[in-house]
C-alpha cells in the first residue's frame, strides 16, 4: 500500500493551505478571536469553500458532490484543523457522511444536495435522556443527525429546541438540542460504516492541530532567548519538541491508514478508524499542552495564540468517543 498523495491530492492540499494562509495573513488568530468573541462563523471562508465545492468533496456526484473519497476529505480536515477555521465544516461533513452511508436512497436524494453545496449546514449530536447536551455547529445547523443507543435519526432544526451553550472551544458554536417527541426519520443503512468515516475526519482535524502546534512551538523556541541562547538549544526543550514530532507523526500515520482503508479496503476500516481516533485524540491534547509549556509564562495567557489549539484538541478528542473508548472498541474487534 502507498500512502503517498497523488498529484490531484497534493493540489487539493496546496490550494487549501494557500487559501487558509492568505486568510491568516489578513488576520490570523486575531481574526479567529474576533469570530469567537462575536460567536459567529467566518462566513467569507464558508463562501469560498462553497465555491470550491469542498463541502461535498467526498459525496457522490449524483448528490452534488465531487465524487472523491475519504483521503481527500482527510486532507481538507487536516488543513482546516491547522488553521482552526471558525466554520461548521467538520460538523457538516460528519452529518453528510452519516446520511450518505446510513440513509435511504430517498433520504440521500433529498438531504445531501444542499449539504454538498454548502447551502445548508448540519451537525451531529448524541442523545442522552432525550437531549443532546453539546452539539458542535448546532447554532448554524439546518439539519441534525442525532445518535442514541446504536441508532440514528435525521431531522430539520425546526423540529428541535436549540439553545446555545458555552464551550471550552469558542471557535465554533455549541448548542444543547432537544428534539420534539417522535420527530425525525430513522437512518437504517450502514450506520457503523458512516461512523467510522466520521472518526477518520475528526482524527484528521486533530492531526492538523498537532502539526500547527508543533510548527508554532519550534519557531518560538528558535527565536526566544534566555542567557543569550535560544531556549530550543536546551535539552529539556528540544526533547519535548522531539516528542511532539513523534506524537504528531504517529497520529498522522494511523489517520492516513484509516483514510486509505475507508476508500480501498473497508473491511479494515473499523479497527483502523478506532486506532486513528485514539492516537490522534491523545496526540493533539499532549502536543498542544506541550506547546503551551514550551512557550513559558506567555503560553498561559489569553493574549497568546497557542491556547486556541489546546481548546480545539480537547473538544475534538471527545467527539464520538475519546481515546479510552476507542481503545476499548479496538480491543473488542481484535
Model-derived regions, located:
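Generic beta-strand or strand-like secondary-structure segments
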Residues: 75, 79, 94-98, 110
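Short, flexible active-site-proximal loops enriched in glycine and acidic residues
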Residues: 83-92
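FAD-binding core of flavoproteins
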Residues: 85, 97, 105-219, 229
Amino acid at each position: 500500500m502507498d500512502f503517498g498523495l497523488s498529484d490531484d491530492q497534493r493540489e487539493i492540499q496546496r490550494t487549501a493551505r494557500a487559501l487558509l494562509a492568505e486568510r491568516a495573513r489578513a488576520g490570523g488568530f486575531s481574526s479567529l478571536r474576533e469570530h469567537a468573541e462575536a460567536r459567529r462563523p467566518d462566513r467569507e471562508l464558508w463562501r469560498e469553500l462553497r465555491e470550491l465545492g469542498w463541502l461535498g468533496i467526498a459525496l457522490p456526484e449524483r448528490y452534488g458532490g465531487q465524487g472523491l473519497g475519504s483521503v481527500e476529505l482527510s486532507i481538507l480536515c487536516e488543513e482546516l484543523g491547522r488553521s482552526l477555521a471558525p466554520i461548521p465544516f467538520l460538523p457538516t461533513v460528519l452529518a453528510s457522511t452519516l446520511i450518505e452511508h446510513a440513509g435511504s436512497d430517498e433520504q440521500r436524494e433529498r438531504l445531501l444536495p444542499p449539504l454538498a453545496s454548502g447551502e445548508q449546514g448540519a451537525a451531529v449530536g448524541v442523545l442522552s435522556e432525550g437531549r443532546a447536551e453539546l452539539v458542535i455547529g448546532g447554532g448554524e445547523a439546518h439539519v441534525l443527525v442525532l445518535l442514541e443507543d446504536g441508532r440514528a435519526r435525521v431531522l430539520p432544526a425546526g423540529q428541535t429546541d436549540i439553545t446555545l451553550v458555552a464551550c471550552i472551544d469558542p471557535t465554533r458554536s455549541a448548542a444543547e438540542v432537544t428534539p420534539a417527541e417522535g420527530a425525525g426519520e430513522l437512518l437504517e443503512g450502514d450506520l457503523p460504516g458512516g461512523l467510522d468515516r466520521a472518526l477518520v475526519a475528526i482524527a484528521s482535524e486533530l492531526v492538523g492541530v498537532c502539526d500547527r502546534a508543533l510548527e508554532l512551538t519550534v519557531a518560538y523556541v528558535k527565536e526566544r532567548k534566555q542567557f543569550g541562547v535560544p531556549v530550543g538549544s536546551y535539552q529539556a526543550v528540544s526533547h519535548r519538541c522531539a516528542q511532539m514530532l513523534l506524537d504528531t507523526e504517529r497520529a498522522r500515520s494511523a489517520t492516513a491508514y484509516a483514510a486509505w482503508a475507508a476508500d480501498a479496503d473497508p473491511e479494515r476500516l473499523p479497527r483502523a478508524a478506532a486506532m486513528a481516533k485514539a492516537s490522534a485524540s491523545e496526540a493533539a491534547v499532549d502536543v498542544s499542552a506541550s506547546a503551551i509549556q514550551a512557550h513559558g509564562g506567555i503560553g498561559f495567557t489569553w493574549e497568546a495564540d497557542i491556547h486556541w489549539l489546546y481548546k480545539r484538541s480537547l473538544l475534538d478528542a471527545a467527539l464520538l468517543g475519546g481515546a479510552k473508548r476507542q481503545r476499548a472498541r479496538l480491543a473488542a474487534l481484535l
